[in-house]
Amino acid sequence: MLEVSVAAILLLQINFAVFAAIFLFCLCRSFNLNIILVGFTYLLPLVPWWLGSAQVERILIVSYCNLIFGIVEIVFFTLTERQEDVKFNKAYLQQLFGHVLPIIAALIGMSFVSRTTLIPVDIWELIIIAILFTFGTALRVLAISQLGFLRFKFNIAFRDKQTLKTDQLHKYMRHPTYTGMMFVILAYAVTTHSWYAGIIGTFFAFFGFQYRIHFEEQALKEQFGKDYENYRAKTPMWLPFLN
């Protein structure tokens, strides 16, 4: 296996520099632990060092996936995050260890497994990764855009004038933002070219989302009462028609 080419290293360095610059800008705008966690989740797999004899195409796929999705995530969280939402209490720590850290472990872990995989990327693998990643990213962006800045946030918190969302994508599934990200997680899993790493990473992410959903739906029930119970009874959690 040949060393990673100079051109590939240059692309990796550009991706790293672009995301690092956006990360720093977001930190200047909203400096808090949530933004730091999101930023480092996608920055670490972008490091253009310690590549050795690696599979160039696979490393570049990992780099661009983390660059594109990382920008989406950190920009949305920076735009929607408010200082009053970040409260270091029991509920925050529950979400940190039960929801956030398992997903971070999945994303970083599968990214680094992919970076060390020596098997070349074939055309069908590339097509599957592209479809899963593009669909998942588009679904998440659309779902967040439809939710709006009041409803989408890192922590489980409710703001003044916030209403229950039951139309558009939320008419067909209760958590389209999480569904979108799970498709992206599946793209990361395929990129590893390892059944073990892919299944373990996907399990960690799925556990993290289910943990979040458990507490989020409890909070929604307390906030909106019967309206949420009726919505939950008729609307699937993850995918349309799978209630």
Question: Which residues make up each language-model segment?
Answer:
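Cytosolic histidine kinase catalytic core of two-component systems
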Residues: T177, K226-D227
